[in-house]
């Protein structure tokens, strides 16, 4: 089953003035499309691995042939991460309810959570992602991953683990047209476009046995 580029569900300029339309268009139609194309190419002769969603595949990278591992890790990871990212973006939503209560419980305050998340995003050397994850013990945590690694890959591969609720892409292609080298400014703008309704849904439903974006 070939992967396909998901539709955004909103216009490229829907997140203006925080995220610009040109970056969104290039990021989605060029960068994400490349991950989809390369993932499909890597899986072309591995139909047993191509079944199901990318999140399921990334939890069992140990089953991937060694000569395909890097390509699948990078490109299926990129497809999964971006698919989650697009759904995590929307103006005008509010952090509330059970998710807000859990954030206050585990970080002390919403402000403390945001500060920790911003630090993870700003200090990720080179390319990667910052994440809010739900751990197996039921607590929330902030982690970061390099390149297109995802927490669903597990600690041995990604250096962390957890069920991703919210991710921020800190590759330069995600922000450089608008923010140039000012990554901290990009991170600050992110809070204006987080789709807290989507994040809360992931927190409350925790899609069983799947780390995709259904």
UniProtKB/Swiss-Prot annotation:
Gene3D superfamilies: Fe,Mn superoxide dismutase (SOD) domain, Iron/manganese superoxide dismutase, C-terminal domain
Cofactor: Mn(2+)
The protein's Enzyme Commission number: 1.15.1.1
Coiled coil: none
Reaction it catalyzes: 2 superoxide + 2 H(+) = H2O2 + O2
Cofactor note: Binds 1 Mn(2+) ion per subunit.
Enzyme class: oxidoreductase
SUPFAM superfamilies reported for this sequence: Fe,Mn superoxide dismutase (SOD), C-terminal domain, Fe,Mn superoxide dismutase (SOD), N-terminal domain
Entry keyword Oxidoreductase: yes
Protein residues bound to Mn(2+): 27, 82, 169, 173
Keywords: Manganese, Metal-binding, Oxidoreductase
Pfam families associated with the record: Sod_Fe_C (PF02777), Sod_Fe_N (PF00081)
Cytoplasm listed as a keyword: no
GO function terms (MF aspect): metal ion binding; superoxide dismutase activity
NCBIfam families, A to Z: PRK10925.1
Role noted for this protein: Destroys superoxide anion radicals which are normally produced within the cells and which are toxic to biological systems.
Protein name: Superoxide dismutase [Mn]
Organism: Pasteurella multocida (strain Pm70)
């Amino acid at each position: 089953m070939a992967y396909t580029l998901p539709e955004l569900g909103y216009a490229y300029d829907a997140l203006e003035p925080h995220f610009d339309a040109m970056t969104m268009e290039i990021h989605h139609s060029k960068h994400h499309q490349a991950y989809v194309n390369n993932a499909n190419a890597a899986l072309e002769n591995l139909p047993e691995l191509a079944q199901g969603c990318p999140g399921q595949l990334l939890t069992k990278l140990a089953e991937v042939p060694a000569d395909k591992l890097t390509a699948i890790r990078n490109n299926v990871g990129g497809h999964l991460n971006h698919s989650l990212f697009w759904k995590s973006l929307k103006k005008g939503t509010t952090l509330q309810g059970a998710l807000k209560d859990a954030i206050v419980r585990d970080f002390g305050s919403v402000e403390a959570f945001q500060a920790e998340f911003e630090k993870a995003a700003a200090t990720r050397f080179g390319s990667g992602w910052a994440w809010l994850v739900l751990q197996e013990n039921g607590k929330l945590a902030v982690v970061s991953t390099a390149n297109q690694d995802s927490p669903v890959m597990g600690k041995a591969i990604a250096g962390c683990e957890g069920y991703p609720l919210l991710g921020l892409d800190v590759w330069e292609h995600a922000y450089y047209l608008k923010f140039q080298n000012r990554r901290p400014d990009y991170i600050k703008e992110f809070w204006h476009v987080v789709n807290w309704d989507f994040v809360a849904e992931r927190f409350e439903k925790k899609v069983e046995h799947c780390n995709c974006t259904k």
